[in-house]
């Protein structure tokens, strides 16, 4: 084998030795052997590897000769070893070492890299220089070294490249190619010029807008001056004739004068005055906004004193013309008001109210017939309300009930009062929406009487009364004209109050010697009545309406009070008022409490607020019950006085009421209830007992603090009999027929302005409330929820003070109980039989059940407090 191989090797060498190209044979052989492996790379880098291939071919040929000589022709494969070595050398030449930058370029750079484009040139200097340029470019990209050109112009501070950043701007574009300094300066100049041009465009647009605004201001000044001349001519031409009532309202005209008196009148002067430049005035109008026009228009160009005085004189003339016009239309407006008959009365409008109007500060100004005055005159009234209270007399009537413990501060925020102006022969009653919050200092609660004397006489005060029946066409209910004299009473603190009381003429109550009377109490579906019939003929209620002014109020506010004289047959009837109200076992009181609690059942929760309300109500019940029990014990000793003395005092009271026109009543201190917190009051009673139907009266008689007083014939003083804080409501269309016995019991109804429910004072629909007297419970468990108040707007009673639902059965409680020794009382009741549902409710809302619920509420409160303490995190110092 070896010889054979050696023979073949020798024959090969001979063959190559015999060839003419002997010297180049090793090189060609090596190139031929390594061409298949190195051919792709040789095409790209032939010039770079040519010298290495020559040296490799020479070394391989020498190794082959030495090995052949050592083997002696016995190893035929010795010649193939250099081919493999050359192969490795060529590969190592093409695939460079990791330290070679060319290899890194081929591996780590993409095809778009500038390095791959320079590999085929065969010069390492270019490769290294290109790589160094790329590194500097990367460094420049991280930290640019080219400085920005400095702009010396002030405009460049705001709109140039180096501008102060006011708004978040877009990131600047970064050029990948290194630009020369000249190119960078050229680009910055172009951008600066573009921004400067844009700024000039904005300035031109703003200038156009300013010029247009100046033109509008000039037109406005001319129009204002023309309107000023028209106003002067209009006031002089529009004089009301004797038959035509001009359809104007005083307040809008006054408001227009008030707003334009300084500008329009100043610009409406003649040319003889000092002229002023229109352009300068337009510039001032452009500088100042609308809120400063009243100042800048007058003070802009140094107007003369005579010019301003002339403006004030013309303003006074306009006021005088307006005043004459209002006074001329006073009587015509009165006739129009009296001739308008309301067809139906809504529950939200009082029967004494004809039209909604506002009283303005002008003296002798009647209520304007325009219903839009409420909205227009709100601001003027708030501005001038102090002058109104100081100059314009008005009477505030109210039909709200006292709280259990009324505070001494004035509770008169956001209330609606009724202003009544009474003339000598006619009555003008209007309703105003007045904001009485804040101050009632130096207020006068008087009537606008035409006479200037303090002690005047009010004639025919109750001549006209409006019927509360919607279907009744006759609006006036005539009464017999009587004179009632009034006197001025000045208290210690309220020093300038002139107190007048307009007393409606009631029908005189007939006397009856008999003491027997029948109490007929019946209930229907939606109405119930309480009527007291005498044995012979039914007689009606006499009402005493004095005015009560508290003297210890710190804010000088004035409360109006009413006292109702309920004529009973015996003095001892009043002593039993307390016992019937304080008795929890009374079925009537229990049923009322059940009704009150049942209405709250739907909204009652076991929350913290309801528990607090429940416990507070229970505490109030216990406290007031103890106070009234003491009052009832004291009243029992006073009540059983001599009947003869009571009879004589009743007779004296009757005679005094008949001689009222010629007698001035002295100021007598009335009884102070315990629930008034020792608040002294001065009472000026004017007893008027006339025949009249209470059902036709528009007033709602509310009784909250009952002070039953007895008159003794010996000392002619009134002593307190008892104090009762239960609540009564005498419906506006109800009839209370009381037989006047031999003595009278006075139940004083102290009313004052309340803060919450005066706006809900209204008369109800008479179809549902005819012949009805509502008895209110003594204590009211109420939450301030508007759902509970919706059912009572129809019931002609202030909202939140009734605890019965008017749609359900209404319980009727007797106002007076006759004495068993002197009178016999028969109760005839046609009440519904008690159903299982009512029995269940009676059991559910019994005093024991209420006490149990109270204990549960206390337990829940304690558990909640304990849970709060336990759940609180303990902080360690």
UniProtKB/Swiss-Prot annotation:
Region listing for Disordered, in residue ranges: 1-82, 450-479, 626-664, 818-877
Biased composition, class Basic and acidic residues, residue ranges: 454-476, 840-859
Post-translational modification: Phosphorylated by ATR.
Phosphoserine, modified sites: 467
Residue ranges annotated as motif ATR-activation domain (AAD): 107-113
Domain text: The RBM1 (RPA1-binding, also named RPA70N-binding) motif mediates interaction with RPA1. The RBM2 (RPA2-binding, also named RPA32C-binding) motif mediates interaction with RPA2. The ATR-activation domain (AAD) motif is required to bind and activate ATR.
InterPro entries: ETAA1
Function, in words: Replication stress response protein that accumulates at DNA damage sites and promotes replication fork progression and integrity. Recruited to stalled replication forks via interaction with the RPA complex and directly stimulates ATR kinase activity independently of TOPBP1. Probably only regulates a subset of ATR targets.
Organism the protein comes from: Mus musculus
GO BP term (any one): mitotic G2/M transition checkpoint
Keyword annotations of the record: Coiled coil, DNA damage, DNA repair, Isopeptide bond, Nucleus, Phosphoprotein, Ubl conjugation
Taxonomic superkingdom: Eukaryota
Name listed for the protein in its UniProt record: Ewing's tumor-associated antigen 1 homolog
Lineage: Eukaryota, Metazoa, Chordata, Craniata, Vertebrata
Compositionally biased region (Basic residues): 56-65
UniProt entry tagged with the keyword Lyase: no
Low complexity compositional bias, start-end: 637-662
Motif (RBM1 motif): 607-622
